[in-house]
Amino acid sequence: MDFINIEKKWQEFWWKNKSFEPKDDFNLPKKYILSMLPYPSGEIHMGHVRNYTIGDALARYYRLHHYNVLHPMGFDSFGMPAENAAIKHGIHPKTWTYENIEAMQKEFEALGFSFSKNREFATSDPDYTKFEQQFFIDLWEKGLIYRKKAMLNWCPNDKTVLANEQVIDGRCWRCDTEVVQKELYQYYLKITNYAEELLKDLETLEDHWPSQVLIMQKNWIGKSSGLQFGFKIADECLKACNGIQEIEVFTTRADTIYGVTYIAIAPEHPLVEHAIKRVSQEDSKIIKAILNTTQRERALEKKGAFLGIYAIHPLTKQKIPVWVANFALANYGSGALMGVPACDERDFEFANLYHIPIKVITQSLQNLPHTKEEVLKNSGEWSDLSSSVAREQIIAYFEKENLGKRVINYRLQDWGVSRQRYWGAPIPMIHCKHCGIVPETQLPVTLPEDIVIDGEGNPLEKHASWKFAQCPKCHKDALRETDTMDTFIQSSWYFLRYTTPKNQRENQAFDQNYLKYFMPVDTYIGGIEHAILHLLYARFFTKALRDLGYLHLDEPFKQLITQGMVLKDGAKMSKSKGNVVSPKEILKKYGADAARLFILFAAPPAKELEWNDSALEGAHRFIKRLYDKANAITPTTSKPEFKGVILNEAQKLARKKVYEALKKSHEIFNKTESTYAFNTLIASCMEALNALSAQNNERILCEGYFVLLQILEPIIPHTAWELSERLFKRENFKPIAIDESALMEDFMTLGLTINGKRRAELKVNINASKEEIIVLAKKELEKYLEKASVKKEIYVPNKLVNFVIA
């Protein structure tokens, strides 16, 4: 079998005939199958191969069954690696990026992926940037983007800001460098405006998304209900607070309010800037040190300092000391917390560390802290009530007395989207001394190509002819925004752009007819590592564009498949571990079909896949055997029929196995709750080929191949097309009805029991009468019944025979 030339032949055929382009007929049933687009690093890895093989199998199946399939691919082509390559190799980021795209396109083609070429694009293409910049302006004008100065996560290696979601355990999500804090201006997308909708709409995805992803998003959004109220600054401290009169806090445990013995505020809290003058030099150093540490460092150990001021408890009127604490976060709630050491582990630890008093407010005799809800004491009129009852009554009291109010809080923070780098989509804003921040009117704002990238800061800041611009409003001298957009913006709407053909994209982000027809994506495939980054942002962006009038839908992805990692020697493949398997080498040695077959057979999509060379060789052998066995078949253009034909057991088994595989194929691809266990489908096909090989009827072999090659086309397309063309002129690439008669059993197996205890099994003809079955059952159980007196004979059709004996 010359797999190299066979694969090349069909790849050229598909390309020449535009075999994978969706039709413009909006009356056809559609399927939009999408794998997450890759960063164009220059070469694909086995993780890519697995992801795209899963998606391609789905797309090919639905095409065979007369769906209008959109199965596109593009490239997430902005980002830091291109700038790093420019520094390392002295090559322009644009040149490096587009050369890599070309190389990856060839690899995709070599794997037989059935992508629509007419939908392909890179997110760094100017006509993509043009509409992204228009979205940015629209969001700005609608109030969904704002700019402010804040302490931000800064990656010293990439020299750029990171969103909270891009900091993993205190390190940069991309390069693993430890993140520090830096004060900068930043544009923010108001994702918090959509927190409740993002949370509520998770319910619509429950039967179609992995539960783990739903839980991760729910926790990240972090909805909580509680009491918001203020501690008034003590009169003698007001002067030091420069007009700030109270400290606002939020708590989900209003029932513990009588246990407050200190207030903890974040070092970024506005009170600190003024009151820090009252503290000792040593405490001032502690506060400033906390200010310059990342959230990860703050979580390692509790640290704080007394701010030298007091606030008044709203109920007891006692003075409560105000502390700066590293566990109080400026970006959650108001940046202030009430410290209740008797009822909270963290508060207890901090109080013990700094010898802050602890007030017990529960009747439990257990060791402190009492974190569970219990009966209260030392809690004024709410003593002797349970925590839950007291909590509701205290909130009601605060609202009645105008001391506070019940509010909903979210852990989710607004999305910072400014990045201090060159290779990204320019933020289309102009800074004018006279007009303020003004949106650009000439789009797209493109990047200058005559730049020097040396790793020192943002190259756009140093490019005078690009940076200095004219205000679109007053036409006076102004400065162009030099930050570029977070690349997660590009991946938050690319799936919408795919719906529109290339020749209709110039003047519109997407054509409404195509958009309404193809969206939402029916099946989306990618790694679970994107659960709270890309997937959350894409959901938000869809809703925001809907509210701008661009879209008609609430959720972008109907079904989500999160494929597991590809491992070798028990670890994720990486160059540093020396366990990388090159797709190019696999294709050269075994071919694309063998690689695809192994990928789909080795493990279900959601599970991790352990690389196994011998299993890959086994996949190659199966394809060769399938190919060689086809030589015994006489070409035809129709499936042989067997109505009324008498067959022997081997022949019946062969037909049964073939149609079992066909039935399993439909179940795997079409069931709503399907886990896409391609491994079980492939196992069924292997069983069918074994059964076909064990019988000697050429017409049954022909029928078997007619069906099997259709089943296998999504998995090993080159081989399936080659054999189907040769044997059947591809007439088998149409929906095939399951021959139910082939699945009917001639025999059934019955359980044989005595007094309900199972003793044996009996295989009998399915048409045998009750009397015949009883006789055969007695004979089978002769050794148990010969000395017994049978009182009753019970036959449960198709299941068992039971004898009741004395």
UniProtKB/Swiss-Prot annotation:
One cellular-component annotation, GO: cytosol
Location in or out of the cell: Cytoplasm
Organism: Helicobacter pylori (strain HPAG1)
Protein name: Leucine--tRNA ligase
Binding-site positions, ATP: K575
CDD domains: LeuRS_core
Lipoprotein in keyword set: no
PANTHER family registered for this protein in UniProt: LEUCINE--TRNA LIGASE, MITOCHONDRIAL, LEUCYL-TRNA SYNTHETASE
Superkingdom per UniProt: Bacteria
Database matches in InterPro entries: aa-tRNA-synth_I_CS, aa-tRNA-synth_Ia, Leu-tRNA-ligase, Leu_tRNA-synth_edit, Methionyl/Leucyl_tRNA_Synth, Rossmann-like_a/b/a_fold, tRNAsynth_Ia_anticodon-bd, Val/Leu/Ile-tRNA-synth_edit
UniProt keywords, alphabetically: Aminoacyl-tRNA synthetase, ATP-binding, Cytoplasm, Ligase, Nucleotide-binding, Protein biosynthesis
Swiss-Prot/TrEMBL catalytic activity: tRNA(Leu) + L-leucine + ATP = L-leucyl-tRNA(Leu) + AMP + diphosphate
GO biological process terms held by the UniProt record: leucyl-tRNA aminoacylation
MF annotations from Gene Ontology: aminoacyl-tRNA deacylase activity; ATP binding; leucine-tRNA ligase activity
Motif 'HIGH' region, residue numbers: 38-48
PROSITE patterns: AA_TRNA_LIGASE_I (PS00178)
Pfam families in alphabetical order: tRNA-synt_1 (PF00133), tRNA-synt_1_2 (PF13603), tRNA-synt_1g (PF09334)
Family of this protein: Belongs to the class-I aminoacyl-tRNA synthetase family.
Top-tier EC class: ligase
